[in-house]
Amino acid sequence: MAEKGITAPKGFVASATTAGIKASGNPDMALVVNQGPEFSAAAVFTRNRVFAAPVKVSRENVADGQIRAVLYNAGNANACNGLQGEKDARESVSHLAQNLGLEDSDIGVCSTGLIGELLPMDKLNAGIDQLTAEGALGDNGAAAAKAIMTTDTVDKETVVFADGWTVGGMGKGVGMMAPSLATMLVCLTTDASVTQEMAQIALANATAVTFDTLDIDGSTSTNDTVFLLASGASGITPTQDELNDAVYAACSDIAAKLQADAEGVTKRVAVTVVGTTNNEQAINAARTVARDNLFKCAMFGSDPNWGRVLAAVGMADADMEPEKISVFFNGQAVCLDSTGAPGAREVDLSGADIDVRIDLGTSGEGQATVRTTDLSFSYVEINSAYSS
């Protein structure tokens, strides 16, 4: 049993292979299988109204609360491919179901990569045969985590040990990240014995305060998907609060890894807003700052430019006292009552982690934190050549 990742909990096996979908020749397909005895499943998906074919198929299949296997491919998003894209997604599901002796409705499917290119179905189906070949499925969570990478530089795994039961997970995604998950595919597994309702509550609560508050570049993917699969193999049923805590811890860890590996990242930035009417307004204000390119450029340059913070937050749909706003960088006041504080320009932001705190001055109880990164030369270079 693995020390971390999707095969750390009891009842799960995985496989990975190189099907030739990625131009790099790196591994590009993975499979996660729940061996039971239970098969509860929960999921959350992108809120982008232009969503990929695998999202449509997975939404349909998880609707009954059970998923027994999830198929992943990297290098091709199978998004914006019309009816052919949906046909291909369903064909891959049927092929896998037949190989595993399952129903089509037991299968989740996830794709990531370039938008607008048809899947090479000959390679995909051959890859499915490799993933399900005799001896392929086993304690291969680490290999699966590597196979789903696209522009990621490192694989992302996690594990949370509870009282006799475990939550494991893997994720990918470094760009096109904005609330509504973040361009990412995440698979969480647990050997706890839980109902679909318990799993969905835990997953929805966790993603709302982890992945949904990760905003790298303001772009929301067509393919975002997070699955939580429960095998019940531990024989232990946690309370809802215990499950919530473990799933949150797993999501938080993966979200931190996504932020740390964001495309071109040199700074990991947390933007916290307080002093507005409610949490919804606070998160709107934090996102407004986190998405502001001038602010992000200042972070790249280690420049404590509080004026850019004020200019950005002033555009937010949040209650504020425009003449009473305060800004703190790494705990040091740089702006008080919307005016520069002594020593503001001397604040040292040369470290990799920057904490920005903004008080909107209303004395309201709203507060929220959004995690983002700087805007570097490397980010532009990576994304200017993504389809070439």
From Swiss-Prot:
Pfam families in the record: ArgJ
Keyword Transmembrane: no
Protein encoded by which gene: argJ
Binding residues annotated for substrate, in chain numbering: 150, 172, 183, 263, 383, 388
Function: Catalyzes two activities which are involved in the cyclic version of arginine biosynthesis: the synthesis of N-acetylglutamate from glutamate and acetyl-CoA as the acetyl donor, and of ornithine by transacetylation between N(2)-acetylornithine and glutamate.
Keyword Oxidoreductase (UniProt): no
Top-rank taxon, per record: Bacteria
Gene3D superfamilies from the UniProt entry: ArgJ beta chain, C-terminal domain (3.10.20.340), L-amino peptidase D-ALA esterase/amidase (3.60.70.12)
UniProt-listed PANTHER family: ARGININE BIOSYNTHESIS BIFUNCTIONAL PROTEIN ARGJ, ARGININE BIOSYNTHESIS BIFUNCTIONAL PROTEIN ARGJ, MITOCHONDRIAL
Name of the protein this chain belongs to: Arginine biosynthesis bifunctional protein ArgJ
Coiled-coil segments: none
Pathway: Amino-acid biosynthesis; L-arginine biosynthesis; L-ornithine and N-acetyl-L-glutamate from L-glutamate and N(2)-acetyl-L-ornithine (cyclic): step 1/1; Amino-acid biosynthesis; L-arginine biosynthesis; N(2)-acetyl-L-ornithine from L-glutamate: step 1/4
Catalytic machinery residues: 183
UniProt GO BP: L-arginine biosynthetic process; ornithine biosynthetic process
Subunit structure of this chain's protein: Heterotetramer of two alpha and two beta chains.
EC number of the protein: 2.3.1.35, 2.3.1.1
The organism's taxonomic lineage, starting at the top: Bacteria, Bacillati, Actinomycetota, Actinomycetes, Mycobacteriales
Family: Belongs to the ArgJ family.
Principal place of residence: cytoplasm
